[in-house]
Design a protein with these regions (language model features):
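Short Pro/Gly-enriched beta-strand edge/turn motifs at strand-loop
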Residues: 1-6, 110-114, 134-137
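Active-site HxH/HxHxD metal-binding segment of metal-dependent hydrolases
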Residues: 36, 44-132, 218-221
Length: 223
């Protein structure tokens, strides 16, 4: 059995999005690259070679460092087909409205420049489910549309869950941002979230990690 992965979390001070770096045999797998310089420094300090990036969804706070990572490292990007489409659009990846979004979310306290950008299509895409092995670790990705068309959940070794922008501590599921669809979430996204194993150590796209239990699911109406 491979050693239990202990993800390293990098939180973007601007958007509070979480990037996770998983390591195995001096190699790295990165989930939702957000801050290039911090990721690069961590990889260099720990002498890690990044091999893959997995995206939980297409919003810009979860892909902000994707272009720089591709420019400076030889790696592959994995995400859902819908996410791959979304990262190529300034509307779907939210960069077109990000300055305004951050301004209103901060109640007028935050004025920042957030130039729109797009990314190239992912190297590996899937529609519903993707199974793979990375450095002896089992990777299971499953589509969970609703927050965005391309949202997914990721389970590693049946032990840890990366939930993207679902199960953010203290927040309801948001479907009002670009690409969000309440009806799709009710019909498809919830079906995926209901089926996730419990209890399981969970690392969300924002906020701290926690144990996902049936009780937590019930708080989100997942009966």
């Amino acid at each position: 059995m491979p050693a239990v992965i202990q993800p390293h979390c990098i939180t973007d001070p601007l958007t509070q999005s979480n990037c996770y770096i998983l390591t195995a045999e001096s190699h790295a797998l990165i989930i939702d690259p957000n801050c290039y310089q911090e990721i690069h420094s961590y990889l260099a300090n720990h002498q890690l070679v990044p091999e893959y990036i997995i995206l939980t969804h297409e919003h810009c706070d979860h892909i902000a460092a994707l272009n720089d990572m591709r420019k400076n490292y030889d790696l592959k990007v994995l995400c859902s087909a819908a996410c791959s489409q979304g990262i190529q659009s300034t509307t779907l990846n939210m960069t077109r409205i990000m300055e305004t979004y951050l301004y209103f979310k901060s109640q007028g306290e935050l004025r920042v420049s957030y130039p729109p950008f797009i990314c190239q299509a992912a190297d590996i895409v899937f529609d519903d489910i993707y199974l793979a092995t990375w450095r002896s670790h089992a990777i299971f990705c499953i589509a969970a549309p609703g927050h965005t068309p391309g949202s997914i959940c990721i389970i590693i070794d049946e032990k840890i869950l990366f939930s993207g922008d679902y199960f953010i501590p203290g927040e309801e599921v948001i479907t009002r941002l670009p690409g969000g669809d309440e009806a799709v979430y009710e019909q498809q996204g919830k079906a995926t979230l209901r089926c996730l194993p419990t209890p399981i150590l969970t690392y969300p796209g924002h906020g701290g990690h926690f144990i996902l239990t049936q009780e937590v699911k019930k708080e989100y109406g997942l009966y």
